[in-house]
Structure formats: structure tokens, C-alpha cells
Design a protein with these regions (language model features):
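Conserved short alpha-helical segments that host acidic/polar catalytic motifs at enzyme active sites
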Residues: 1-250, 254, 269-300, 338, ...
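Generic C-terminus detector
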Residues: 548, 561-563, 573-614
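Active-site phosphate/pyrophosphate-binding segments
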Residues: 264-268, 272-302, 392-521, 594-614
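Glycine-rich phosphate-binding loops that contact phosphosugars or nucleotide phosphates
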Residues: 296-438, 442-445, 525-566, 589, ...
């Protein structure tokens, strides 16, 4: 993995490919490369370690002419980060070039077979094995390129999204997908390729999201041809994407992450638009209207997710159980799919993923669906794989999230889970009218209260400078605030590279308290709710051991203000909605500490935005 771009048409391909790679930088990568076929049918492949800027500099004195090309940003999976292991990879003859996202699981067996037949390899990657296999089949069986690709992919086990060039047929690109996203943009006598739509939308809003097992032939001057591995012609749906190009730029902010933190009030307004009606004091989700029977009669909900989405799921669990009186389990998708879980037709599985392409979550959806469960998706990326695989669901509608560390997607996911719990509870009759109306009205007020929290940015920026020395942080919360503590710790780890752990506050005495000393900052979410007094006792225990307390409190709190080292006050809200406000100071704290330490906030080391391989 991580990013695929391609172009075939009448324009110079190189600038389109480079701009496309820049659009995909948010996904994370360690090297980049490009392959172009020029008018003399020469195949030129250029690769470099590091950023796209390095590739552009390397190509500054190279022949980058041509109207057909493919390009790639790579996160190392097989073979170390290097120019040699970067994509594109080319065949032994130099006729074919390929880019690939995914993992070929049986690459070692295929490589041994090819080496036994005299094929020589340059790199350590599974991707080179694939291009060598395609050429070997093409030449030894005297097949055309499409048929050779179909035969080769029949031998392959694993996930892939590929784009393939042959300099002998310079007017076509062949692409294929299995368990890794791939989008084809359709322009005026031209085609575009992307891992997602972001490299494409500047040129066309007409796209085809390839399905697993699809192989597409992009031939200049012809219609898009899509077939399966058995060469049966398919008729994919051409969709219209609506992405504002301004959402793909920083908009005057120094980093995408800060921009996206500040976008959250507007994002939540968009998320609730047409769903939360304050005039009628009602929450309406089309999924519950269309699939009321399946959702109301469910005996159990299972939430599957990874990372930040898993934390949102933990908040959703508490709301669904509290309001709907349905038992809820929250599972890491990577564990769920491999532990032979008990799944029945009475279960509703909620799959949460910002990208809609998270490999483990997608596999968990397939497992649950195969076992008869009803699947509800909560995603951000419209047209992505998980929404297409589910029975129904809700988009969070927060716009493209470019920063690798999720911010607005988290609050969008929590908002959708809140609306789902409220709407379902009302249908089931498990929530009182007064509680329902109070929460609906307060939910509508959350975006304005978020704006007040964001006014604390300068204060949190100053506070962050005090704690850049720390090598460890502890985050504590109880009830709805415990997942917020987990999320705050994750944000700090992701972008500042400071070790941090989130714990239920009461569990501090069962181990973590041994770590607390004068060098240990402890972030405590201590808003004024039912467990306030107990959390106050935890803070006193931290202070007794000389720990430095950063307390997130409800405005007007005098008790904690007297004992905590630093206090951040939040507007008053209902307990179940506190995560939507309390998470923002933790996002800002992580951001400003990372900036103070000189870290790459938008592209932290070793992390990819969309984890499309296991």
C-alpha cells in the first residue's frame, strides 16, 4: 500500500500524476514513483525514497513526456523503504510496469516457481512477483495482456488493487481490484485512476467504484470495459461524486489536523442536517424507517471497528444500552474476524470506519453477513466498500478528512451513534419523552458549544509548552468519559510520539498509580456528572503522589480548580453528549504538543490514513 494514481488521455500525464500523488499524501507513505509511456513507446520508470517532492526533484532532468502513466506512493510491507522497492515495478523484459496496493499472501511460492524457470528479481517486494508472473504467463502462453492478467490473478491469494502498463500497447491501462479500493474516473476521451476519488475530482465527477473481482480496461478513445476474472462483461454503475476541492486544501491553517479540529461545529451541523429537527423535536434516520423491524427486534448489537472508530463505538455502546436496553458488544474488527465468534440472524452488526475501506472491518462485515447478521454501516467516504457491503447505514457527512489522526470523523461517528440510539429508543418506547426531548434539543446546541470550546485554542497552545518534556501521559475518565480518555491518549501517541495510556479512573489503583510521580502528567476528564465525586477522589490521589493534573471540567467548577495544576472548562451539557465537547481540548493538546516538538502532524511516522491491508 498506499496510494495509486493513473491517467490515460490526451494531456501530459506527469503533472496530473504528481498532483494526484499529492492529493494522496494524507494516506502516509515512505517512497514514491511514476511510470510513463512516451510517444516513442519507451517506458520510463522513476522512483525515489521519501516524499513526492523528492520524486519531482529526481525527475527534473528526466524525460517525463507521455499521455499515459501510473504513479504510486508506498508504505513498506514487503522489503524496506528504498527506491529499489518503491513502485512502479517492471518486468524482466522492461515491457510491463505495475503499481499495487495490498498484500500477495502466496508471493513466496510464486516467486520460487518463477525463479526455477529462470526469472530474475530486482527487489524484495511481493508486487514485483506479480508483474513477473503476468509477463511469464503472457509470453509462455502467447496471450494478450488482459487474458494474462486474468490467468495470473487466478493464481494469486491476497488483497490487491493494481494498475498495469505495457509499452507495446501504449493506449491502454489495465486495472484490477480485490479487497483493496480502486476508483476509475471517466472524463472526455480520458480516464483517471485513484485509490480514492481525491486525485480525480479536479478533472471529473463521474466515477466507477470497482468491486472485488473486477478488471477494467482503460483504452484511449473507447468506452470503459469492465470484466471479471472469467472475462464476463459487467455493467458497473457510473456515480457522481460531490467533493469540494476546498476541502482538500488547508484553507489558511498550518496543518490539515488543525483545520479539521476547527471544522467540527460545521461538520456536526452537516451531520445532523435533515436528521435532527428542533421544530418537531425529533430525530429521523432513514435507515430506521426502512429497516425498523430488523433493528427493533435485534437481540444484540455488535459494533466492529478499529482505532478511533472503536473508541466511538464504546460511546455508542453506552448510549444504545442506556436508551434502547439492548445488549451491545464492541469488538476490534481484527480480533472479531479470527476468533470464531457466535453470530446469529438476531444480531445487528454496526461497522464503523471513516474511510469505509478498513480491511479488518470489511472482513468482519463479510463474516457477519455470511452468518446471517443484519449489517449497519457508519462511514464517511461515500461510495466506499463498507457502505456497499452493508444492508443499510448512515454517512457521517463531515467531508474529506486529510489529517492521518482522526478528529472530525470521531465526533461525526459519535453524533451518528447518538442519533441512532435516540431514534431507535423512541421506536422501541424505551426512553421517556422528557429525556428524549431534552437530549434532542441539547444535541442541536452542541455545534455552538463546540465553538466556545475552540476559543480555548490559544490557552491550550500555551499550556502544551509546559508538558513537552514528558515521556509518558496518563488519561483518566469514567462512564462516557472513559472512551474519551482512550481517544485522547491515542491522539497524543499518534502525532507527538509520546507514550500515553487511557484508563477508567477507578482502575488507576489497580496498577497505573505505581507510575505516578512529579514527571507524570495526568489528564482527567472530570465533568460534573453522576461520578464526579469519585473522579475528584482520583484526582486527589494523583496529587498526593505529586502527579501533574490537567483537568477537563464543567465551567464554574471550583472544587477541582483548587487542586488541579491546569484546568480547562467546558460548557455545560448532558452527560451522554459530553464526549463531543471533551474530546476537543484533547485533540488540541495533542496537536500543540506535537507542533512544539517539531513533529509532522498531518503525516506521522509509520501511520497510514486508510489501513487497507491486514
Amino acid at each position: 500500500m498506499c496510494g495509486i494514481v493513473g491517467y490515460i488521455g490526451n494531456k501530459d500525464a506527469f503533472p496530473i500524476l504528481i498532483k494526484g500523488l499529492r492529493r494522496l499524501e494524507y494516506r502516509g507513505y515512505d517512497s514514491a514513483g511514476v511510470a510513463l509511456v512516451n510517444s516513442d513507446t519507451a517506458l520510463n520508470v522513476y522512483k525515489s525514497k521519501g516524499k513526492v517532492d523528492n520524486l519531482v526533484e529526481y525527475c527534473s532532468d528526466k524525460n517525463v513526456s507521455g499521455t499515459v502513466g501510473i504513479a504510486h506512493t508506498r508504505w513498506a510491507t514487503h522489503g524496506e523503504p528504498s527506491a529499489l522497492n518503491a513502485h512502479p515495478h517492471y518486468s524482466e523484459s522492461g515491457n510491463l510496469a505495475i503499481i499495487h496496493n495490498g498484500i500477495i499472501e502466496n508471493y513466496s511460492d510464486i516467486k520460487k516457481k518463477l525463479m526455477a524457470n529462470g526469472v530474475k528479481f530486482r527487489s524484495e517486494t511481493d508486487t514485483e512477483v506479480l508483474v513477473q508472473l503476468i509477463e511469464y504467463i503472457k509470453e509462455h502462453k502467447n496471450l494478450d495482456l488482459l487474458t494474462a492478467v486474468q490467468v495470473a490473478l487466478h493464481e494469486v491469494i491476497g488483497a490487491y488493487a493494481i494498475a498495469l502498463l505495457d509499452k507495446r500497447t501504449p493506449h491502454q491501462i489495465i486495472v484490477a481490484r480485490n479487497q483493496s479500493p480502486l476508483v476509475v474516473g471517466i472524463g472526455d476521451d480520458e480516464f483517471f485512476i485513484g485509490s480514492d476519488a481525491s486525485p480525480i475530482v479536479e478533472y471529473t465527477d463521474k466515477v466507477v467504484y470497482l468491486e472485488d473481482g473486477n478488471i477494467a480496461v482503460l483504452h484511449k478513445g473507447e468506452e470503459l470495459k469492465v470484466v471479471n476474472i472469467l472475462n464476463r462483461r459487467l455493467n458497473p454503475e457510473i456515480q457522481t461524486v460531490d467533493i469540494n476541492l476546498g476541502q482538500l486544501d488547508k484553507g489558511g491553517y498550518p496543518h490539515f489536523m488543525l483545520k479539521e479540529i476547527f471544522e467540527q461545529p460545521d461538520c456536526l451541523t452537516n451531520c445532523m442536517r435533515g436528521r435532527v429537527n428542533v421544530d418537531t423535536d425529533n430525530v429521523v434516520l432513514s435507515a430506521i424507517i426502512d429497516y425498523k423491524k430488523q433493528l427493533i427486534n435485534a437481540k444484540r448489537f455488535i459494533i466492529v471497528a478499529c482505532g478511533t472508530s472503536w473508541h466511538a463505538g464504546q460511546i455508542g455502546k453506552q448510549m444504545i444500552e442506556n436508551f434502547c436496553r439492548i445488549p451491545v458488544e464492541v469488538e476490534y474488527a481484527s480480533e472479531f474476524r479470527y476468533r470464531n465468534p457466535v453470530i446469529t440472524s438476531d444480531d445487528v452488526v454496526i461497522a464503523i470506519s471513516q474511510s469505509g475501506e478498513t480491511a479488518d472491518t470489511l472482513a468482519a462485515v463479510k463474516l457477519a453477513k455470511d452468518n446471517g447478521a443484519f449489517i449497519y454501516g457508519i462511514c464517511n467516504a461515500i461510495g466506499s466498500s463498507i457502505p456497499r457491503a452493508t444492508n443499510t447505514g448512515s454517512y457521517i457527512h463531515v467531508g474529506p478528512e486529510i489529517g492521518v489522526a482522526s478528529t472530525k470523523a470521531f465526533t461525526g461517528q459519535v453524533t451518528v451513534l447518538t442519533m441512532l440510539a435516540l431514534a431507535l429508543a423512541k421506536e422501541k418506547g424505551t426512553i421517556s419523552s422528557s429525556d428524549y426531548l431534552e437530549i434532542v434539543k441539547e444535541l442541536h446546541e452542541i455545534p455552538e458549544k463546540m465553538k466556545k470550546v475552540l476559543e480555548l485554542n490559544d490557552r491550550i497552545s500555551e499550556l502544551s509548552r509546559i508538558f513537552t518534556y514528558a515521556h509518558n501521559f496518563l488519561y483518566l475518565g469514567r462512564g462516557y468519559s472513559y472512551p474519551v480518555a482512550l481517544e485522547g491518549a491515542l491522539k497524543l501517541k499518534e502525532i507527538s510520539y509520546i507514550h500515553a495510556e487511557g484508563y477508567p479512573a477507578a482502575e488507576m489503583k489497580h496498577g497505573p498509580i505505581a507510575l505516578i510521580d512529579s514527571d507524570m502528567p495526568v489528564v482527567v476528564i472530570a465533568t460534573h456528572n453522576a461520578m464526579y465525586e469519585k473522579v475528584l477522589s482520583n484526582i486527589q490521589e494523583v496529587k498526593a503522589r505529586k502527579g501533574k493534573v490537567i483537568a477537563i471540567v464543567t465551567e464554574g467548577d471550583d472544587n477541582i480548580s483548587r487542586i488541579a495544576d491546569e484546568v480547562i472548562e467546558l460548557p455545560t451539557t448532558i452527560e451522554c453528549l459530553e464526549p463531543l465537547l471533551a474530546t476537543i481540548p484533547l485533540q488540541l493538546l495533542a496537536y500543540h504538543i506535537a507542533v512544539c516538538k517539531g513533529k509532522n502532524v498531518d503525516q506521522p511516522r509509520n501511520l497510514a490514513k486508510s489501513v487497507t491491508v491486514e
